[in-house]
């Protein structure tokens, strides 16, 4: 069994996974999943405790004596780890594949050697579980859903030991967020600080899960489209696989219209705003004023823009709005936006490029402030410089990315205020955005 994470896996976790792989090789009988994971995490805990708490001046015998005195501690740890592992599986944070995918660039020569040993054709031919499958099919990962699942030697496991959490899910009155319920779908007024359908490592704390429970449904609701975790507003959840496919088709055919209300830190011009977004699925999303071959067109239409008071300190505290250092926090600008293309972070990135970042947007506002203070810092902006070499340009891009901050923890000034499809035959609106909230 080989433990891995995504492409950013550390060599430490690969090494721990390889230790279990060797253990299974010595005793290649099928093992219950949670037993192996418990052993894996216990090994990690022992290594950590031994490394940080055993004095380095101890002789081997003294160290063994010290460890024997900590038996009670380790037993307590093992129980807690067992409970922790059950939670990880419940959260959907554990995956498996019959054959391990290619190791990451950080893998050592020894780790690569062991990987090759357990994925050699002569070894794979002996495994009954992958007969009739191509290597690519056998390397496909699946989420573990039961703690009593059995695995065999050579199985790949990916364990996300630090799932992204969404504590706000437990603070929401979910029934009050339901906008509409039909036989085919549910429309939800999604709270900010929550995930629509969950993340790679957490499908438990999601809008789909909590809305399903609030309505007492026996079949889980399904995600049809996404909005950012820090965005609130209208989301359509399908009640059946069939309608999920139907709604996806409507999105592809551009039959779904979305209106947003954005709270910007500066005024935004009325009309259509166009940029080009770098086709890399990684935040922050970089956009260019000018056309760049291969970059994706981003268009939105600002329908109106009006002055409103900047959210007061009480509202900011209630909704955990982050202070991103905007110089003047008295007047904000509420904009109604028709989203013409649906790119990830599109409104956030485009308005920041217009020197009007969203209130509370800790990712894009710092970069917008940096560009305002040092025009030309943005290598794709209005005041971009001419670079003499590709190396200089690459360094400028790296420096520009570093000007961006982290993803907001809870909320930004953005609401998906209306969603409609089939030429307005189905139209739904969210409640008042958080910044209009009256504090009792």
Name each model-derived stretch.
Residues 22-28:
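Hydrophobic alpha-helical transmembrane segments
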Residues 12, 17, 25, 33, ...:
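Pseudouridine synthases involved in rRNA/tRNA modification
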Residues 50, 146-156, 161-210, 215, ...:
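RNA pseudouridine synthases
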Residues 30-36:
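Short, aromatic-rich membrane-interface segments at the entry and exit
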Residues 2-9, 13-16, 20-22:
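Short, low-complexity, Lys/Arg-enriched N-terminal segments of secretory-pathway carbohydrate enzymes
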Residues 94-96:
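A short, conserved structural fragment
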Residues 92, 133-136, 141, 262:
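Contiguous, often N-terminal, cationic amphipathic patches that form binding interfaces
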């Amino acid at each position: 069994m080989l433990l891995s994470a995504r492409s950013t896996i550390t060599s430490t976790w690969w090494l721990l996974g390889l230790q279990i792989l060797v253990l299974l090789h010595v005793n290649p009988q099928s093992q219950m999943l949670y037993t192996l994971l418990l052993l894996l995490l216990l090994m990690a805990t022992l290594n950590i405790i031994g490394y940080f708490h055993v004095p380095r001046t101890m002789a081997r015998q003294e160290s063994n004596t010290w460890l024997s005195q900590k038996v009670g501690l380790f037993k307590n740890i093992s129980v807690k780890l067992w409970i922790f592992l059950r939670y990880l599986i419940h959260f959907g944070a554990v995956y498996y594949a019959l054959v391990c995918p290619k190791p990451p660039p950080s893998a050592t020569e020894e780790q690569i050697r062991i990987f090759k040993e357990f994925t050699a054709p002569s070894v794979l031919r002996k495994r009954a579980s992958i007969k009739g499958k191509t290597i690519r099919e056998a390397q496909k990962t699946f989420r573990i859903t039961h703690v009593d699942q059995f695995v065999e030697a050579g199985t790949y496991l990916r364990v996300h030991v630090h799932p992204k959490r969404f504590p706000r899910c437990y603070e929401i009155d979910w029934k009050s967020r339901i906008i509409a319920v039909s036989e085919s779908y549910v429309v939800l007024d999604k709270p900010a600080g929550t995930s629509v359908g969950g993340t790679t490592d957490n499908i438990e704390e999601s809008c789909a899960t909590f809305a399903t429970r609030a309505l007492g449904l026996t079949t889980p609701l399904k995600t049809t489209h996404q909005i950012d975790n820090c965005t609130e507003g209208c989301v359509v959840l399908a009640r059946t696989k069939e309608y999920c496919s139907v709604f996806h088709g409507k999105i592809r055919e551009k039959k779904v219209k979305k209106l947003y209300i954005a709270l910007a830190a500066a005024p935004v011009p009325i009309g259509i705003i166009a940029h080009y977004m770098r086709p890399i699925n990684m935040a922050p999303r970089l956009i260019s004023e000018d056309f760049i071959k291969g970059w994706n067109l981003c268009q939105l239409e600002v329908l109106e823009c009006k002055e409103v008071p900047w959210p007061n300190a009480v509202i900011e505290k209630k909704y955990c709005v982050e202070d991103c250092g905007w110089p003047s926090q008295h007047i904000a600008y509420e904009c109604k936006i028709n989203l013409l293309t649906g790119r990830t972070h599109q409104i956030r990135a485009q308005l920041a490029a217009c020197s009007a970042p969203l209130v509370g947007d800790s990712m894009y506002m710092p970069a917008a402030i940096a560009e305002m203070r040092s025009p030309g810092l943005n290598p794709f902006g209005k005041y971009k410089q001419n670079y003499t070499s590709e190396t200089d340009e690459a360094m400028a891009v790296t420096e520009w990315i570093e000007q961006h901050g982290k993803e907001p923890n809870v909320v930004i000034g953005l609401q998906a205020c209306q969603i409609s499809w089939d030429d307005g035959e189905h139209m739904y609106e969210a409640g008042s955005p958080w910044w209009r909230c009256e504090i009792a």
